[in-house]
Every structure is written in structure tokens, then in C-alpha cells.
Regions:
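Conserved kinase catalytic-core segment
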Residues: 1-13, 63, 67-135
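Conserved ATP-binding subdomain of kinase catalytic cores across diverse folds
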Residues: 1-64
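ATP-dependent kinase catalytic cores of phosphoinositide-metabolizing enzymes
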Residues: 14, 171-175, 179-180, 192, ...
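A glycine-rich phosphate-binding loop feature that marks nucleotide/adenosyl-phosphate handling sites
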Residues: 25-30, 109-115, 181
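Small/polar glycine-rich anion-binding or flexible loop at a beta-alpha turn
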Residues: 26, 175-187, 195
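A short beta-strand motif that forms the metal-chelation/ATP-contact edge
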Residues: 30-35, 186-192
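Catalytic-core segments of enzymes that bind and process phosphorylated/nucleotide-bearing substrates
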Residues: 52-75, 112-172
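Regulatory N- and C-terminal appendages and interdomain linkers associated
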Residues: 78, 118, 122, 166, ...
Length: 217
């Protein structure tokens, strides 16, 4: 339920996400997503190459927490065929994940995907594995899985504005992107209230969203 909620919040924020839903099973609700690297067209299966940032940075899976978001930005600049659009999307995702307490955006939670089979052109894949980690695990005090401006905690608005320079985003544009997300706070709080989460988890998530958006104002 928590992943479905955060993914739906991301949809509301205009973030591209993999198709996702909750389905009823014998043991209760189950969360499902659709693979975006395989497409069935008529009688043919289109197979799109999809590489996560761990692979693109030539790192082993166990090193997925090593690195920085600055390094992620360099990977996008190096491999994306639409750098400007993908950099803005990447930036918005990081601000969003900060707001909802998703502190697990490591190198394997970002990927580039082929635009068409064999095209050799890659773009940032839709978002996946978005979770309110800080609400689910309140003992985890880190706000990010990778460093931004050399730190994973005590992130402030100034850190995002500085990071915008790395992404090739002007300060004015960064301010607007942040403002657009902060404006969604009342809707996100309402979504928490109406969600299937336990009340205690709802309260923790709402508190995180309110505190983080205040930091960004």
C-alpha cells in the first residue's frame, strides 16, 4: 500500500512512472508493476535495452550506495539522447523523494532505457521503487541514499538550488520546479488520509511531508 501511494503521488507531481496498481489476492492486497523494457506489439515482443546507473557507472550491485547524485547527473549527460528533459525529470524526482521521505534512491533505482529496440538512443526510464522509507523506518535518519553536495542528511533548499547548477538548470527554473511540488502538499496530505496505510504510518508520513515542504519554502 505504501509503494502504491507514493507512486500515485509521483503521478500527481507529473513524474513519469512505470504502470502500477494494487490487486486483490487470497492473502490480501498485492502491489504490481508492468515491465517497461518489454512491449508486445501484434505477434512480436519488442525488447528494449535498460541499464541502471550501477551498470552504467561500471559498479557492482553491492556498490549501489556508493557515489553521488552529481555522478548520476554526469551519467545522464553522457548517455541520454534528451539531456535537458531527463535532467529536469531527474531533478524533480530527487526533490519529490526528499519531500516524501524516500531515502533509498540508490544507483539501481535510476535507469536509462532504449527509445526503440536497437535504436541505440537512451532516455531516463519511468520511475520505479518509490517508497516512504523514512516513514516506514523512522530510525533511518539519512534523507538520501547517495550524497548531494557531499551529504546525505540535513538537506536544505540551498542544496537543491546548488545542485540545479550541476543539472544545468537555472536557479529561477529550479525555484519554480520546487514551488510546483510544494503546492501539492494539501493534496498529498489528503491522499495519505484516504490511503490504506495504518494510522501510525499515515501520521509519520504526513509529518515528514509537512516538515520537508517547510524546509523548501
Amino acid at each position: 500500500e505504501s509503494e502504491q501511494l507514493i507512486m500515485t503521488m509521483a503521478d500527481m507531481a507529473g513524474i513519469s512512472t512505470v504502470p502500477h496498481a494494487l490487486i486483490k489476492g487470497n492473502a490480501g492486497l498485492a502491489y504490481i508493476t508492468k515491465r517497461v523494457d518489454r512491449n508486445l506489439t501484434d505477434d512480436k515482443i519488442e525488447m528494449l535495452a535498460m541499464e541502471d546507473f550501477c551498470q552504467l557507472d561500471l559498479r557492482l550491485t553491492e556498490d549501489k550506495y556508493r557515489g553521488s547524485y552529481e555522478r548520476c547527473a554526469k551519467i545522464i549527460k553522457q548517455y541520454s539522447s534528451r539531456v535537458g528533459i531527463d535532467m529536469a525529470e531527474f531533478y524533480i524526482r530527487l526533490v519529490f523523494c526528499f519531500i516524501v521521505g524516500n531515502s533509498d534512491m540508490h544507483l539501481k533505482n535510476f535507469s536509462l532505457i532504449e527509445t526503440a529496440e536497437g535504436s541505440g538512443e537512451y532516455v531516463l526510464s519511468p520511475a520505479y521503487d518509490l517508497l516512504p522509507v523514512n516513514a516506514n523506518m523512522p530510525a533511518d535518519k539519512e534523507q538520501f541514499a547517495l550524497a548531494m553536495n557531499g551529504k546525505k542528511m540535513n538537506i536544505r533548499k540551498g542544496d537543491f538550488l546548488k545542485f540545479a547548477d550541476t543539472c544545468g538548470i537555472t536557479r529561477q527554473t529550479a525555484e519554480k520546479l520546487i514551488e510546483n511540488l510544494v503546492k501539492l502538499t494539501p493534496k498529498w496530505i489528503a491522499m495519505c488520509e484516504n490511503s490504506l496505510l495504518p494510522d501510525e504510518l499515515k501520521d509519520r508520513l504526513k509529518k515528514i511531508i509537512i516538515e520537508r515542504t517547510e524546509v523548501l519554502q
